């Protein structure tokens, strides 16, 4: 086969791949599928992408390579026909609070450019467009100052820019200027110290020194004109008699200060200034609209848009509690009589008793306790058993007291304690828009840049399509190319089903599927051709309705002339592909082979392919023969949920059932289930400090004694954490080894078999098994420790054997092998068998937690819950548990979830996978659309009821599935 038409892989052995030979057609949409852990990602990411990326990076200079992450060479004999590779995974969502949907997609960068070039500044005082100031207006403003005021007339020639500026200073000296102000300090030009070119500097030239007198006008006008020429339309009148000593950097002494007038200076601009309030904008450049740049960022919140502030709801978590019983949470833990005596004194002044509930206090009394007596003096009597005293003073208030202590304390422990009562609130200075007043005063079509980022992508798309109608000819010409780039990117975001997000949405709050689709939209926006794209389950978190749009996007990427490889389990994606590779036959050591390849029809015709059997209907996830009975009395009821886009929603969740919360992306599922129900329930039942979304109340929590959110966050952030340590299987394994005759004879305790503490571990690598060597412009090399040869333990520890295996050998077994190996040790076997039950028999007992995918981490947590003794009163909440699961794995997972329900527990899942929804006892469908068009309950009831609701998109797709597939009593066809 010619290299041009195929990517030819020979002898791929990465991870569990069994010497795979494969030819993939170029410029096609290729789907790789197979059971979880069968080797799809090993082939797509760790072999094909890694080699494509490595070869591209290797072609760069050694200097450039040190800035790029270099991939390890995969274990493969040969790959031909590769292009430079780009991977779009789910793991790389930025948690940086400064990263937003707008910045990630680069739409915000184009918006900054648009506002800088065609935006019109308006005065906050008058609401009128800001005009430029004339020299006469500037002179009048200075003459209006108090007579005798001494001023420097300065020209701000450098503002916040890096450089040494030796040449510029020499030029100024030649022109006859003698003094400059550099970074807040005055110097003779000859005496200016060398400036560090790596740092930003401010340089003002002293053009004149004047004393305000009525006859100053002519001289002042000349000086100001000189300034305006030197500093590109800017001039500063700085008060010489300022309170700070000369030689110190003045607070706000730089020309870029946001207010045009301070106690030190007046900033004039012949470009933009409000004649009424004097509000001046130094410049309108793209950086003015950047919240990551000091020129544009709101100085109060540093461009984050939020501030940590004491939250009154966390101070008084339960309004029905009595004051003496700890209604004021920060005081509740203290055993000192001081706080109760403080409340008694306040009670005498405001007419309440300490036995009163918080809800019974007057508004005046509540305000006094929380915010202080505002100068009103209170007489306090204190008696701590050792001494008694009386004092009369105003009461500071719980919240001001905590705020003061938080600012003043040097103790990390004290800060942490106080932070438990703090919540993130929108910044009061910028209202959460992140920018300075100057940036927000610039508008296009009566909207500032912050208001546009708050729109949903759907609305922003419509706004940008219509806005050039309000431009004049010149503005239209300037904006044409910028608008084209913005509209294209918004259109792509719409196409991948993200029309409900806002551009201001923080990247850290996006789900894996959302962030992946955002990066997908950015890639299409870049318009590259001849590239190899490797994607990891882009359909995660996407409703069936939006699936077609996503697949159109992938086909568009292919049609640009790229090869698109997608690791995917979605039926529609597999059937749409040009070429399908099915890897199996099972997971882990039992996988790693290509079972079937070719068109979707070829896969269905292949009798060895498990995927083919599910696609053709020969096997299926079956609908239960009968659904559980719904209790009319035992149910949870969420009343009046109003968080995010929820529109005062109330819904019942029957206890002891399997409930699915469904709906299109952005319909309000996570807000309803995680932000409202889970956070409120865990606060009431588990005593957590999570702050739930706005709602009236939740009824029925008395039927529960535990609430658990089994999410996809990592089970540990270090390589030392693994499935055995997380599920608790490692403790009985260590105990077992410590109980062996050889260990007893040597006096070894269980700690001897831990790789985290000194004693039994190899000290050369400190129990890691590998040693990291930094290589700068080559990838960091992890070399196997030459003392323990990667075993993590020292020789003496490894001498203790059970059935001929050391503790290191046990950690290297798959979970399946481990369960068999410890079949006679129930404490270990039972925990490992639960991992097998959730479909994780293929992972290693000691596999590093950092190498587990989100779906795998979630199933490890599920296994841990399964191994606990059932109380039958637990509420389990899972967000998309089928992430990364093949049809066959979904069937297994459903068995596990239904088993939890059979024990009397309640399981609620957020899910788009119709195979899961059809087996649910109860469905709550939210929508009908995403974002503003969602937040309502569209349908509720059994799956058969949802199908009847015309407005429900879920119902429409579910109807096809229920009609297509018969009912069976078994959970999965074997």
UniProtKB/Swiss-Prot annotation:
This is UvrABC system protein A. It comes from Brucella abortus (strain 2308). It comes from the Bacteria. Keywords: ATP-binding, Cytoplasm, DNA damage, DNA excision, DNA repair, DNA-binding, Excision nuclease, Metal-binding, Nucleotide-binding, Repeat, SOS response, Zinc, Zinc-finger. Belongs to the ABC transporter superfamily. UvrA family. Pfam families: UvrA_DNA-bind, UvrA_inter. Gene3D superfamilies: ABC transporter ATPase domain-like (1.10.8.280), ABC transporter ATPase like domain (1.20.1580.10), ATP-grasp fold, A domain (3.30.1490.20), P-loop containing nucleotide triphosphate hydrolases (3.40.50.300). Its main location: cytoplasm. ATP binds at residues 34-41, 663-670. It is found in: Cytoplasm. The UvrABC repair system catalyzes the recognition and processing of DNA lesions. UvrA is an ATPase and a DNA-binding protein. A damage recognition complex composed of 2 UvrA and 2 UvrB subunits scans DNA for abnormalities. When the presence of a lesion has been verified by UvrB, the UvrA molecules dissociate.
């Amino acid at each position: 086969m010619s290299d041009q038409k195929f990517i030819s892989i020979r002898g791929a052995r990465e991870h569990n791949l069994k010497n795979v030979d494969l030819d993939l057609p170029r410029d096609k949409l290729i789907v790789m599928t197979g059971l979880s852990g069968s080797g799809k990602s090993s082939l797509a990411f760790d072999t094909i992408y890694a080699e494509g990326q490595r070869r591209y990076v290797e072609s760069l200079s050694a200097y450039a390579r040190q800035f790029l992450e270099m991939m390890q060479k995969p274990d493969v004999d040969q790959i031909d026909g590769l292009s430079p590779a780009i991977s779009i995974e789910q793991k790389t969502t930025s948690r940086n609070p400064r990263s937003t949907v707008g910045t990630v997609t680069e739409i915000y960068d184009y918006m900054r450019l648009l506002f800088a070039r065609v935006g019109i500044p308006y005065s906050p005082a008058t609401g009128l467009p800001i005009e430029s100031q004339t020299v006469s207006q500037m002179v009048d403003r200075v003459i209006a100052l108090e007579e005798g005021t001494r001023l420097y007339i300065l020209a701000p020639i450098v503002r916040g820019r890096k450089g040494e500026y030796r040449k510029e200073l020499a030029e100024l000296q030649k022109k006859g200027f003698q003094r400059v102000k550099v970074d807040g300090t005055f110097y003779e030009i000859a005496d200016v110290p060398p400036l560090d070119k790596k740092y930003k500097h401010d340089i003002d030239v002293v053009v004149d020194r004047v004393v305000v007198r009525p006859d100053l006008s002519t001289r002042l006008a000349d000086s100001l004109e000189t300034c305006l020429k030197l500093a590109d339309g800017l001039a500063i009148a700085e008060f010489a008699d300022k309170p700070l000593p000369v030689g110190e950097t003045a607070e706000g002494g730089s020309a870029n200060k946001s207010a045009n007038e301070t106690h030190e200076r007046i900033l004039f601009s012949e470009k933009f200034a409000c004649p009424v309030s004097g509000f001046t904008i130094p410049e309108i450049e793209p950086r003015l609209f950047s919240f990551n740049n000091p020129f544009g960022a709101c100085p109060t919140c540093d461009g984050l848009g939020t501030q940590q502030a004491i939250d009154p709801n966390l101070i008084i978590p339960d309004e029905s509690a009595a004051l003496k019983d700890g209604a004021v949470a920060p005081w509740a833990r203290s055993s000192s009589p001081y706080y109760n005596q403080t409340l008694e004194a306040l009670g005498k002044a405001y007419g309440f008793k300490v036995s009163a509930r918080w809800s019974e206090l007057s508004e005046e009394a509540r305000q006094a306790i929380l915010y202080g007596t505002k100068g009103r003096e209170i007489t306090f009597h204190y008696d701590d058993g050792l001494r008694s005293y009386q004092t009369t003073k105003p009461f500071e208030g719980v919240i001001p007291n905590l705020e003061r202590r938080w600012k003043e304390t040097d103790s990390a422990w004290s800060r942490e304690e106080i932070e438990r009562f703090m919540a993130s609130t929108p910044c009061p200075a910028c209202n959460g828009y992140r920018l300075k007043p100057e940036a927000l005063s610039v508008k296009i079509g009566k909207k500032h840049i912050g208001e546009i980022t708050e729109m949903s992508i759907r609305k922003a798309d419509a706004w940008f399509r219509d806005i050039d109608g309000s431009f004049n000819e010149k503005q239209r010409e300037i904006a044409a190319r910028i608008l084209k780039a913005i509209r294209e990117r918004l259109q792509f975001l719409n196409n991948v089903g993200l029309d409900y997000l806002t551009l201001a949405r923080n990247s850290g709050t996006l789900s894996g599927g959302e962030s992946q689709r955002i990066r997908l939209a950015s890639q299409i926006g870049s318009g590259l051709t001849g590239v190899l794209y490797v994607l990891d389950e882009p359909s995660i978190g996407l409703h069936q309705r939006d699936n077609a749009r996503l697949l159109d996007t992938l086909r568009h990427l292919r049609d640009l002339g790229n090869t698109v490889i997608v690791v995917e389990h979605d039926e529609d994606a597999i059937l749409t592909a040009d070429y399908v590779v099915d890897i199996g036959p099972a997971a882990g050591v039992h996988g790693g082979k290509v079972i079937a390849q070719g068109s979707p029809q070829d896969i269905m015709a292949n009798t060895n392919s498990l995927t083919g059997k599910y696609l053709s209907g020969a096997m299926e996830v079956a609908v239960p023969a009968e659904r559980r009975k719904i209790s009319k009395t035992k149910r949870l009821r969420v009343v009046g949920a109003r968080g995010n886009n929820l529109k005062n929603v109330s819904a019942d969740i029957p206890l002891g059932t399997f409930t699915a919360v469904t709906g299109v992306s952005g319909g309000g599922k996570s807000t309803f289930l995680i932000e409202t129900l889970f956070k409120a329930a865990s606060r009431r039942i588990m005593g957590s400090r999570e702050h739930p979304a706005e709602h009236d109340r939740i009824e029925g929590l008395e039927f529960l004694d535990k609430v658990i959110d089994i999410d996809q966050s990592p089970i540990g952030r270090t390589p030392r954490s693994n499935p055995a340590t997380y599920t608790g299987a490692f403790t009985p394994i260590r105990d077992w080894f410590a109980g062996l005759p050889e260990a007893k004879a040597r006096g070894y305790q269980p700690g001897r078999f831990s790789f985290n503490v000194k004693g039994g571990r190899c000290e050369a690598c400190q129990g890691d098994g590998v040693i990291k060597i930094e290589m700068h412009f080559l990838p960091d090399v992890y070399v196997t420790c030459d003392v323990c040869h990667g075993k993590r333990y020292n020789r003496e520890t490894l001498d203790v054997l059970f059935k001929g295996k050391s503790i290191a050998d046990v950690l290297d077994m798959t979970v399946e092998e481990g369960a068999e190996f410890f079949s006679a040790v129930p404490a270990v076997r039972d925990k490992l068998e639960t991992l097998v039950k959730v479909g994780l028999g293929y992972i290693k007992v000691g596999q590093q937690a950092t190498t587990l995918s989100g779906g795998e981490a979630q199933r490890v947590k599920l296994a841990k819950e399964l191994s606990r003794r059932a109380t039958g009163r637990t509420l389990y909440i899972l967000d998309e548990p089928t992430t990364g699961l093949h049809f066959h794995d979904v069937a297994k997972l459903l068995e596990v979830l239904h088993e939890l329900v059979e024990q009397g527990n309640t399981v609620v899942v957020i899910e788009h996978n119709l195979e899961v929804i059809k087996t649910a006892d109860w469905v709550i469908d939210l929508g009908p659309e995403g974002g503003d068009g969602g937040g309502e309950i569209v349908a509720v009831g059994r799956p058969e009821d949802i199908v009847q609701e015309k407005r429900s998109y879920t119902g429409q797709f579910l109807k096809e599935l229920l009609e297509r597939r018969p009912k069976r009593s078994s959970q999965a066809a074997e």
